[in-house]
């Protein structure tokens, strides 16, 4: 497939070539985008393959702290100025960072004909390379890595669901609730968090580090996210400004940037619509066009000289129901497994007390073959999958970690409802389509 001069035509072979004005980006074909990529590392260098190190979601806030003149080092990014140089961020008194949930680099690239503002940014050579998100490539893990400038092995947020060791239950880390508990009779009565978010996620956020330096730090988002468990865990430390409409959230971010400091704006539509309808649906394209309009409004409304950086937490994969595997009906997969955490593209398996993780991993490898990468906890940690792992976090991680390749999904009908097992688009694994995210730089 070839995209030229803002038009689309199809070729029988090869990747996708995106061309407009002076810009040309070759997009691999879908088979290549759905292959597992090497595990990315953390640090302050820009690796030769341009994945990981300082070219990582976790490096964005440290880099921005340096760009606004208040470097905030973290445990995995000790040199914010090096991160700033690697990402190519200019100095500025005021900066806005926008995180568009679910807008992976290749999802963006393959739909740029619908996004005039984002297309204009992709004319710049500095914006034509993706950076990496964390593994697993999912919102809770990525938000915590982004907010703290660290990694899942330190934040204790390593999957959509994971083991809570004290109760030996699965905790769902969007709302910090018991993942397997029955739905409450009255859904309007809030369920208290299973664990205190500040106790689970103990790393200081970059926002907190900046606030301690008396730097203005503002968040603009939906009112309901102001004190949510995920915000408290991963993104605490800002003056949160809640507004109902997207336009008001954008304008609030622009107003805040009149004062030197850092502003964070969250846009969730690409992920939400992708899960409900699929990222290749007309609904997703409409949401994408709306996102582009919001970002263009931000550019027009922000004070001149404001640095604008646009990133995402992960990309999205269109599911193939023919490649869907239900663990519940495969005895080889359920044997020896007490709990199944994670999500359909990235599972964490917790072994029964007398079961060896190596034996579980062997059975899963035999069954899945090249449809997934199966590692024991020790192997995954040694590979650097979660970044540096502290001893407190280690028991929370699965005894076996499984990451799907291709369009494979791994579901469990014993504990998941029909909607959860049939999501049109998902994420979480270690493919380029999920791991590669944009880092688009603009100046108002």
Report residues per predicted region.
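N-terminal start and proteolytic maturation junction detector
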Residues: 9-10
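Feature captures the catalytic ectodomains and active-site-proximal regions of enzymes
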Residues: 13-444
């Amino acid at each position: 497939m070839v995209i030229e001069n803002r038009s689309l035509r199809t070729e029988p072979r090869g990747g996708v070539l995106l061309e407009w004005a002076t810009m040309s980006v070759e997009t691999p074909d879908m088979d290549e985008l759905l292959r597992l990529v090497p595990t990315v590392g953390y640090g302050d260098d820009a690796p030769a393959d341009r994945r990981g190190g300082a070219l990582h979601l976790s490096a964005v806030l440290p880099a921005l702290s340096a760009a606004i003149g208040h470097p905030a080092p973290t445990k995995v990014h000790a040199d914010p100025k090096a991160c700033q140089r690697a990402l190519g961020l200019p100095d500025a008194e005021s900066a806005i960072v926008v995180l568009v949930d679910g807008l992976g680099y290749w999802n963006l690239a393959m739909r740029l004909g619908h996004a005039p503002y984002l297309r204009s940014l992709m004319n710049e050579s500095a914006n034509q390379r993706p950076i990496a998100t964390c593994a697993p490539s999912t919102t809770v893990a990525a938000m915590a890595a982004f907010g703290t400038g660290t990694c899942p092995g330190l934040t204790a947020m390593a999957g959509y669901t994971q083991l809570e060791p004290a109760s030996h239950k699965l905790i769902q880390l969007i709302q910090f609730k018991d993942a397997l508990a029955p739905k409450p009779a009255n859904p309007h009565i809030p369920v208290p968090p299973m664990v205190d978010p500040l106790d689970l996620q103990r790393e200081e956020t970059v926002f907190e580090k900046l606030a301690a330096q008396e730097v203005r730090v503002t968040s603009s988002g939906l009112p309901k996210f102001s004190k949510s468990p995920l915000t408290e865990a991963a993104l605490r430390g800002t003056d949160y400004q809640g507004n109902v409409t997207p336009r008001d959230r954008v304008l609030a971010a622009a107003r805040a940037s009149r004062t030197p400091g850092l502003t964070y704006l969250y846009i969730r539509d690409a992920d939400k619509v992708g899960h409900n309808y699929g990222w290749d649906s007309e609904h997703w394209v409409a949401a994408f066009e709306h996102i582009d309009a919001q970002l263009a409004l931000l550019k027009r409304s922000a004070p001149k000289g404001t640095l604008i950086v646009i990133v995402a937490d992960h990309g999205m994969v269109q599911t193939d129901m023919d490649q869907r595997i239900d663990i519940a009906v495969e005895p080889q997969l359920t044997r020896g497994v007490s709990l199944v955490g994670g999500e359909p593209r990235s599972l964490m398996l917790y072994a029964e007390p007398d079961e060896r993780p190596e034996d579980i991993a062997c059975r899963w490898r035999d069954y899945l073959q090249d449809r997934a990468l199966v590692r024991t906890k020790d192997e995954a940690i040694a590979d650097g999958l979660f970044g540096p792992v502290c001893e407190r976090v280690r028991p929370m991680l699965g005894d076996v970690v499984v990451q799907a390749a291709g369009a494979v999904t791994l579901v469990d009908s014993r504990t998941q409802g029909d909607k959860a097992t049939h999501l049109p688009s998902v994420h979480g694994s270690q493919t380029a389509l999920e791991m590669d995210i944009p880092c688009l730089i603009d100046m108002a």
